[in-house]
């Protein structure tokens, strides 16, 4: 492997697809158990790698050099092997800052609350500090460090948070339901950011958008940090110019198209045509319902009622 991503569980990762859109190089996903990390790094059989959960801090002792910005953050997500020496960088900082700028979410003079205390929370703290936040606080289930509070304390301060940055895995595929904190509970909220990109919009992001708060998931951050990593891999800044185009390409590939309408209005016909045109799988919730119930929807309505139908329909849609 010359270029790739290391982490403990990578089944959800979009990184291979993104890097192979960025340039003509093979990018591999390599899952490592904690006890395998040291041997992998000592072998140095790669040119450049990205690092994800749970190794952004764990890799640091094995590096010959850590760039000052990454050392200040305390987390590394990019490692390059230069002349046999391992050099660590942090491109998540660039990615998160780029996402905030794209979404026009300003941190200047605002109270920023970071959900989580892992490696990515350190990047979020550095971005908030760089962005001129008035107050920066980390929220943890088990607070113990300076500037950390519990979720109970977060809700007790409901008037304070103006920006919420989620760096926890709560809401990430395959356990998409739930959120680390409920945006609706904070009346002065001006922006929400979730580093999770799979699903594209977590419950956390959807809830914020529902109440009119600017919010974004982590896909653009992922693409931007990947472009920055490619710049470091190949010493070529032109990769950064591809960020927006690749983001839109990946978004188009990953977003679902949902057709909603009255019975017999043509949803199935249009859906099949779209499936053929885009190469996406076609799923028909009505057909799935009837196959599961072994009867027509109209018969179910007559005997069970609309409420029961909607409950079962919701379960099917979640599975789809």
Predicted regions and their residues:
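Rossmann-like adenosine-cofactor binding region
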Residues: 147-216
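NAD(P)-binding Rossmann-fold cofactor-contacting core
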Residues: 131-148, 283-293
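Walker A/P-loop
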Residues: 268
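ATP-dependent small-molecule kinase phosphotransfer cores
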Residues: 287-320
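Glycine-rich adenosine-cofactor-binding loop
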Residues: 7, 90-93, 100, 109-129, ...
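Adenosine-phosphate binding glycine-rich loop
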Residues: 195-255
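Phosphate/diphosphate ligand-binding glycine-rich loop within oxidoreductases
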Residues: 2-103, 199-201, 207, 211-214, ...
């Amino acid at each position: 492997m010359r270029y790739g991503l290391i982490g403990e569980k990578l089944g959800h990762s979009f990184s291979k697809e993104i890097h192979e859109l960025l340039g003509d190089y093979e990018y591999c996903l390599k899952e490592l158990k904690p006890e395998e990390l040291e041997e992998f790094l000592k072998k140095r059989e790669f040119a450049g790698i990205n690092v994800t959960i749970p190794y952004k801090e764990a890799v640091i002792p094995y590096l010959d050099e850590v760039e000052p910005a990454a050392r200040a953050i305390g987390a590394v997500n990019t490692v390059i092997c230069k002349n046999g020496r391992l050099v660590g960088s942090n491109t998540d900082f660039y990615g998160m800052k780029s996402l905030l700028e794209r979404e026009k979410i300003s941190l200047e003079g605002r109270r920023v609350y970071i959900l989580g205390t892992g490696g990515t929370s350190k990047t979020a703290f550095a971005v908030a500090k760089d962005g001129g936040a008035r107050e920066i606080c980390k929220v943890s289930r088990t607070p113990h460090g300076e500037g950390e509070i519990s979720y109970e304390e977060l809700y007790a301060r409901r008037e304070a948070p103006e920006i919420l940055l989620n760096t926890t895995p709560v809401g990430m595929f395959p356990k998409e339901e739930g959120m680390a904190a409920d945006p609706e509970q904070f009346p002065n909220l001006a922006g929400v950011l979730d580093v999770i990109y799979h699903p594209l919009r977590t419950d956390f992001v959807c809830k914020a958008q529902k109440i009119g708060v600017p919010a974004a998931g982590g896909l653009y951050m992922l693409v931007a940090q990947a472009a920055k990593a490619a710049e470091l891999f190949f010493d070529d800044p032109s990769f950064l110019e591809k960020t927006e185009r690749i983001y839109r390409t990946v978004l188009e590939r990953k977003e679902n198209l949902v057709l909603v309408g009255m019975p017999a209005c043509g949803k199935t016909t249009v859906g099949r045509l779209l499936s053929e045109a885009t190469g996406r799988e076609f799923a028909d919730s009505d057909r799935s319902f009837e196959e599961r119930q072994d009867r027509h929807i109209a018969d179910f309505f007559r005997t069970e009622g609309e409420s029961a139908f909607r409950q079962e329909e919701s379960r099917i849609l979640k599975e789809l």
